[in-house]
Regions:
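Beta-rich carbohydrate-recognition and catalytic domains
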Residues: 1, 7-78, 82-183
Length: 183
C-alpha cells in the first residue's frame, strides 16, 4: 500500500511505514483492519547497498494499544515521516507521522525509529476531527503543525509542548482555511 519514508539524520538508516492487507481503508474494521507495517533499512558499506528488514506488523499496537479499539480504520498518510531536529531520546531523533482515521486525524510519534509508537496528545480527541489526507511537520521551536485536507480547503493545527522529551503538551483548536481572511 501507500508508504511514507524518512532517512535518519545521524545514522545511515531508513524507516518506511506502509499500509498492508486485503481491505481498503474505507472498509477496514477493528476485526478486519487495514494493516500498518514498518520496514527498516541500513546501508551496508561493504556491499554498497541498502539492506532491508522483514516487515514488522504494528496493527495491534495501533488499533488496540494506542486507540483502545475505538477507531475502525487507520491509514498512515503517504509521503513523508517527519524527523525532529530537536528531540533526541536515546539513539534516535524523534519521528512524527500523520494518521488518518474515520474519527479524524492524529499524529503519532516514535522515539526508537519506528519500533514502538505513541499518540501525540489525545487518542480520543482528534487534532482535526473532519480532516483527511493529513501531513505533519516540526516547527523551528519544536512544535508540530498539521495540514489536513477538507472539502473546499484545509485544516491547520499546532501541538505545543510543555515537556519536549516526554511529549507532554496540547493541540490548539483546528483552524479552517476557508474562515481565515483570504482563505
Amino acid at each position: 500500500g501507500d508508504a511514507c519514508l524518512v532517512a535518519d539524520r545521524k545514522n545511515n538508516e531508513l524507516l518506511l511505514v506502509c499500509a498492508s492487507g486485503d481491505i481498503p481503508y474505507q472498509r477496514s474494521t477493528v476485526e478486519h483492519p487495514l494493516r500498518i507495517e514498518t520496514l527498516r533499512a541500513s546501508y551496508d558499506n561493504v556491499k554498497k547497498q541498502w539492506v532491508w528488514t522483514k516487515p514488522k506488523d504494528h496493527t495491534n499496537e495501533f488499533y488496540n494499544k494506542l486507540f483502545n479499539n475505538a477507531n475502525p480504520s487507520m491509514f498512515m498518510s503517504s509521503g513523508k515521516v517527519c524527523q525532529s531536529s530537536i528531540v533526541k531520546v536515546g539513539k534516535y531523533y524523534r519521528v512524527y507521522a500523520a494518521l488518518c482515521t474515520r474519527k479524524g486525524n492524529f499524529v503519532v510519534y516514535s522515539d526508537d525509529f519506528g519500533d514502538t509508537w505513541n499518540v501525540l496528545g489525545s487518542a480520543t480527541e482528534s487534532c482535526a476531527p473532519q480532516g483527511d489526507e493529513v501531513k505533519c511537520e516540526e516547527l523551528p521551536d519544536g512544535s508540530v503543525i498539521i495540514s489536513s485536507r477538507k472539502d473546499g480547503g484545509r485544516y491547520f493545527n499546532i501541538f505545543h509542548f510543555k515537556d519536549l522529551k516526554k511529549a507532554i503538551g496540547a493541540w490548539e483548536v483546528e483552524v479552517d482555511s476557508r474562515k481565515a481572511k483570504g482563505g
